[in-house]
From Swiss-Prot:
Entry keyword set: Disulfide bond, Ion channel impairing toxin, Knottin, Secreted, Signal, Toxin
Organism: Cyriopagopus hainanus (Chinese bird spider)
Protein name, entry field: U7-theraphotoxin-Hhn1b
Signal peptide (from-to): 1-19
Entry domain remark: The presence of a 'disulfide through disulfide knot' structurally defines this protein as a knottin.
Length: 90
């Protein structure tokens, strides 16, 4: 009887240690993934476009691409780039 109880307690202790190790590993992977996502976001924010594309918000300092024109469209409260009915030259 003492051996059976000792075996059950020992098995529970082993499962607790394994579970704790698995949880720590999962948390480390989650933190690494989050860090990787933040690095990708930072890299994409530093990449500047030379012009704004279709339905992109435009102003004087953010011009539209050659085949778009900046127009105010109701009910949108800001200017957007719309097609000026021309095609870009290749």
């Amino acid at each position: 009887m003492k051996t059976a109880i000792f075996t059950v307690v020992l098995a529970l202790a082993v499962f607790a240690v394994l579970s704790f190790g698995w949880e720590a590993n999962e948390k480390a992977l989650s933190e690494e993934f989050t860090e990787l996502i933040h690095e990708k976001e930072a890299a994409s924010e530093t990449e500047a476009r030379e012009c704004r594309y279709f339905w992109g918000e435009c102003h004087d300092h953010m011009p539209c691409c050659d085949w778009f024109v900046c127009r105010y469209k109701w009910p949108i409260t800001y200017n957007i780039c719309v097609w000026n009915r021309t095609f870009p030259e290749k």
